[in-house]
């Protein structure tokens, strides 16, 4: 296993307004693999994701990327290393090209049209979209542009938060195939929050089950077919929402 792209949680806690959101989370997201995060709403999944790229800071414990504590990595460096795509796929006003240029502009750099076209190709979008207004894109196209924009910094780690939940079945399958291809082609370490348990099973190499801010069970995604923990069985049976 490549050590440099692993993310290790060591007794990580996060508290907000005296309310524990995450409680002593310990575990490792394996490098170059897709780990799906599942659990009921309010389990702390999005909070955990935000801790991975410094949008939030742990109240206690440590998060290590490779061998380096996240607390010692400057935020701009961290966010270049750990990309994030969200359910809403927010776009700035302007063209697809304007959106793809954004990560470079934030670091006083430029993205050529030729480079931008390569990123569109990576996410299976036609070159004709480059100068189209982002507001005119379909939901699936927006999500692909959002992923392409995240890839501009060539992050070895990619965080995905419910990126297919607002898409129809066909568009969701296309995004799943895309993410699997990106993982295979570039060896990107991917952590993917999903409420779709079927998706978690067939897309993920590994799965973490979170309930009430705790990591209940982790292992190969096949655990969703044969869970060991009672709480996981309850969740999968629909007993925990």
Predicted segments with their positions:
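Conserved ABC ATPase signature
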Residues: 133-137, 141
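C-terminal boundary and immediately downstream tail of ABC-type ATPase nucleotide-binding domains
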Residues: 222-241
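Conserved ABC ATPase "signature" region
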Residues: 111-129
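ABC ATPase NBD Q-loop/coupling interface
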Residues: 62-77
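Catalytic Walker B motif of ABC-type/P-loop ATPase nucleotide-binding domains
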Residues: 158-161
């Amino acid at each position: 296993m490549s050590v440099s792209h692993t993310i290790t949680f060591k007794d990580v806690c996060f508290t907000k307004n005296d309310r524990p959101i995450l409680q002593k989370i310990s575990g490792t997201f394996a490098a170059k693999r897709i780990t799906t995060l599942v659990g009921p709403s309010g389990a702390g999944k999005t909070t955990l994701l935000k801790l991975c790229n410094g949008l939030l800071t742990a109240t206690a414990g440590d998060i290590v990327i490779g061998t380096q504590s996240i607390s010692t990595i400057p935020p701009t460096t961290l966010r270049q290393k750990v990309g994030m795509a969200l359910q809403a796929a927010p776009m700035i006003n302007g063209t697809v090209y304007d959106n793809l240029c954004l990560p470079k502009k934030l670091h006083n750099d430029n993205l050529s049209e030729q480079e931008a076209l390569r990123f569109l190709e990576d996410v299976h979008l036609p070159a004709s979209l480059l100068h189209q207004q982002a507001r005119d894109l379909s939901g699936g196209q927006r999500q692909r542009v959002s992923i392409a924009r995240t890839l501009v910094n060539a992050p070895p780690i990619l965080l995905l938060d419910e990126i297919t939940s607002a898409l129809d079945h066909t568009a969701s399958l296309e995004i799943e195939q895309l993410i699997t291809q990106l993982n295979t082609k570039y060896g990107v370490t991917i952590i993917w929050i999903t409420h779709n348990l079927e998706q978690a099973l067939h897309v993920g190499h590994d799965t973490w089950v979170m309930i009430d801010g705790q990591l209940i069970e982790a292992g190969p995604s096949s655990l969703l077919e044969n869970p060991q923990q009672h709480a996981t069985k309850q969740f999968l049976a629909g007993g925990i929402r």
